[in-house]
């Protein structure tokens, strides 16, 4: 530690309570995915307690069962394996002398058939955040490159590390349910929930970015999740429209559909600051309505392009007939499959559309030394032959 703040954090870190047995047990049971190793004859080995029991329910792989010995929920896997290893994380959110502290614990599990699983749990990262959103990181030394998340040097100590190293940013879903928060967060609109956002990112953004703070206070949790997920550019781009929604107490619940809907409105030239358009009573219906309008418009434009293209290519129609008309009566059949030549540009276009290839768009009718035929069974086109 070099600065007074760093020295203070190091001192306070040493005063944090050790992991309790209750917290340890919670992490093992809730952060880890426990597997039931099932043999083909139906015997299941619990990879937590090591006991063996019979599969009475004939479960599919991936379905859950409960070990009758220890009560652990097991994901069933049919295999001949007799051992397994796994790594996972859980975190504890607490406070210490005016800091919001995020403590991350690394769990390493090793299991061998006939024995109980062994677990190694080590605290690997601490993020110390002040009420202004600035934070310092204490962590163990991480091996290899910055993007290796599980290569910890478990023999090292927690020390002040660089905030920007990817290994120290742990996206952890398992969060111990007993949490303590700074009262300072209330002024940013925090009411006890982080709304499925990683807590470190959540508090950092609401305290340093007025956009995130406004979204939280307005109850726009889906937009806030999108903002915290690195899509702030979309929020900034449509901020005037979002403000109209907030002014009219309209909550965006499906961000993907709503932003797609805004793009459709933009294509129609609609006013994106008009609540009548941007705050629909039924987003699904409004989205489908404008999607259908766009589809019809594109279909009309496509037909116009095709007509213009056909007009431009009409000059090749007579040339094609002159060169290939001698083959137009050709009919090859085995009684089931019929093979006939394409006789006009319209037939080339239809063949390309039906078979989804480029026989028309790449002007195969202009090839002087080739004949294009269509193989069919009844009305069904099955192959195009050159």
Where are these regions (language model features)?
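N-terminal alpha-helical interaction blocks
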Residues: 1-37
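Cys/His-rich microdomains that often coordinate metals
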Residues: 50-54, 71-74
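Cysteine-rich micro-motifs
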Residues: 59-76
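Non-catalytic protein-protein interaction scaffold segments in large eukaryotic complex-forming proteins
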Residues: 107-122, 128-252
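Catalytic-core elements of nucleic-acid end-processing and repair enzymes
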Residues: 204-386
């Amino acid at each position: 530690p070099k600065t007074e703040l760093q020295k203070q954090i190091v001192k306070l870190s040493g005063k944090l309570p050790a992991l309790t047995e209750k917290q340890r047990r919670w992490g093992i049971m809730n952060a880890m995915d426990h597997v039931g190793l099932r043999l083909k004859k139906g015997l299941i080995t619990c990879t937590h307690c090591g006991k063996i029991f019979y599969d009475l329910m004939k479960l599919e792989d991936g379905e859950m069962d409960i070990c009758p010995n220890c009560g652990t929920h097991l994901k069933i896997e049919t295999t001949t394996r007799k051992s397994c290893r796994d790594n996972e994380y859980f975190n504890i959110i607490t406070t210490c002398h005016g800091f919001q502290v995020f403590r991350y614990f690394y769990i390493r599990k090793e299991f061998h058939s006939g024995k109980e699983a062994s677990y190694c749990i080590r605290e690997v990262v601490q993020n110390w955040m002040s009420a202004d959103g600035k934070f310092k990181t204490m962590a163990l030394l991480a091996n290899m490159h910055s993007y290796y998340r599980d290569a910890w040097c478990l023999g090292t100590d927690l020390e002040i590390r660089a905030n920007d190293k990817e290994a120290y940013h742990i996206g952890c879903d398992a969060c111990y349910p007993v949490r303590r928060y700074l009262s300072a967060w209330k002024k940013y609109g925090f009411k006890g929930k982080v709304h499925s956002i990683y807590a470190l990112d959540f508090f950092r953004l609401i305290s340093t970015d007025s956009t995130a703070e406004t979204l939280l206070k307005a109850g726009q949790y889906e937009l806030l999740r999108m903002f915290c997920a690195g899509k702030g550019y979309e929020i900034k781009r449509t901020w005037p429209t979002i403000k109209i929604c907030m002014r009219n107490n309209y909550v965006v619940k499906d961000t993907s559909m709503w932003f797609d809907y805004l793009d459709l409105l933009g294509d129609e030239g609609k006013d994106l600051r008009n609540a009548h358009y941007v705050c629909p009573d039924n987003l699904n219906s409004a989205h489908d309505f404008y999607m259908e309008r766009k589809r019809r418009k594109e279909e009309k434009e496509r037909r116009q392009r095709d007509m213009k293209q056909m007009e431009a290519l009409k000059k090749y129609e007579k040339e094609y007939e002159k060169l290939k008309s001698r083959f137009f009566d050709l009919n090859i059949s085995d009684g089931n499959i019929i093979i006939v030549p394409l006789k006009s540009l319209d037939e080339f276009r239809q063949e390309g559309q039906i078979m989804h290839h480029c026989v028309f768009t790449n002007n195969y009718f202009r090839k002087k030394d080739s004949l294009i035929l269509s193989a069919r069974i009844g009305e069904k086109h099955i192959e195009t032959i050159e």
